Amino acid sequence: MSMKWTSALLLIQLSCYLSSGNCGKVLVWPTEFSHWMNIKTILDELVQRGHEVTVLAYSPSILPGPNNPSALKFEICPTSLTETEFEDSVTQLVKRWSDIPKDTFWPHFLQVQEMMWTYGDMIRKFCKDVVSNKKLMKKLQESRFDVVLADAISPCGELLAELLKIPFVYSLRFSPGYAIEKHGGGFLFPPSYVPVVMSEFSDQMTFMERVKNMIYMVYFDFWFQAWDTKKWDQFYSEVLGRPTTLFETMAKAEIWLIRNYWDFQFPHPLLPHVELVGGLHCKPAKPLPKEMEGFVQSSGDNGVVVFSLGSMVSNMSEERANVIASALAKIPQKVLWRFDGNKPDTLGLNTQLYKWLPQNDLLGHPKTRAFITHGGANAIYEAIYHGIPMVGVPLFADQLDNIAHMKAKGARVSLDFNTMSSTDLLHALKTVINDPFYKENAMKLSSIHHDQPVKPLDRAVFWIEFVMRHKGAKHLRVAAYDLTWFQYHSLDVIGFLLACVATVIFIITKCLFCVLKFVRTGKKGKRD
């Protein structure tokens, strides 16, 4: 860490201790790539408020920051996997997921489950390397952390919190089929009006869509497993020295910070310890680099289109690139395209290629007219924040579902990346740019996002600090966590009541038979 950052950190810590004395120590178990963007935003704010933040990373981690000047501390745990091997593994998983046919539900999610298990095996290995490292665990124990902040999509943070005997807070976007939320968090998702995540339904479902939604829910609840829970349950039981399960350990989370909000998500019930903090990474646009600003200003009244398929897509076939470039060349707007590859033959004079774009700053520019996006949650939230209509080109994971949400809210047109033609893309761009319907809906979502009593980032930081101050948030924990599945669904009560009713019916029936028998006996005696 440079002298500049060291001095800044010391000043922050000193000011904290001299003022409120409420500075805490936060241990972080993060997830890579776009997940890191969200959690790092929270960590930077915690540091600004004087807290000491330590990020626990495995040696092949490609988190932005460990080798760069930062006020964050990084505790690196050595593993046998190299950084290149880890990055290649993740890249291959992304490519496999992108190549899975999306038109058939069952085969699609069987392959998704296989890939999730592969990823889970890798995370479990990292977790085992951490908890079995006696030197590291002793250091963590002696550091006396106040809270663990973990991304629930990569298990282990809750295990560390259990071993260190400290509370933990989750950050989560979603899990396939809401598995973590339902089984680890006790969340409620009534299938009659809450579409199963990744089903691409809206909350306004037809009868047949509700039938499919129910089937999907049953499939995710009883068949699909995002993680090989038997392996995780066995691993956690061995480490803790007592029988337990992954979801039982997850259920001890004090607060769930869900990276979503009602501008994006469809309404559904929430538990008291769940906070929606979607878009916490969004911020006002900063000035563009001089050369880029000049290109944007040269667009005149037509404005510009921003095109990015995210950081996970590093290459594109020559055929697809030419199809896209051909469509972009035919619009009057200037185009800024994030593209890392050979220059397409059909590239127009109105299009500039960049290996990296200041996406948030471009979306916040007054001359931006539309955003072509893969549908990643971070990108969509930046578009919502700035009120920009979208053309969605989803590739994998939650992107199809995210784009479906934006379609339901009238803020985007979607295309299939593998089958769209140049004409399709051109028509979609003209639609979202020229039809005021899309801009109006995008601005409406932006207005909803900005009209919150507390900003998402401040809300997230508040609850982390709350857990540190109060050593947890047990008063928000619903009693459902202490019930068995049959108690939760009142099956024992229903069984008892049915038994009571059956007993009463039996007694009444028996009495009637006795009375009838008595009456018959009496009549027979009189005849004799």
From Swiss-Prot:
Q: How does the protein associate with the membrane?
A: Single-pass membrane protein
Signal peptide coordinates:
1-23
| Subcellular location(s) of the protein | Microsome membrane; Endoplasmic reticulum membrane
**A Pfam family matched in the record:** UDPGT
Q: What is the role of this chain?
A: UDPGTs are of major importance in the conjugation and subsequent elimination of potentially toxic xenobiotics and endogenous compounds. This isozyme has glucuronidating capacity on testosterone, dihydrotestosterone, 5-alpha-androstane-3-alpha,17-beta-diol, androsterone, oestradiol, tetrahydroaldosterone and tetrahydrocortisone. This enzyme is essential to inactivation of several steroids.
Which family, according to the similarity comment? Belongs to the UDP-glycosyltransferase family.
Name of the protein in its database record: UDP-glucuronosyltransferase 2B30
Source organism (scientific name)? Macaca fascicularis (Crab-eating macaque)
Taxonomy of the source species: Eukaryota, Metazoa, Chordata, Craniata, Vertebrata
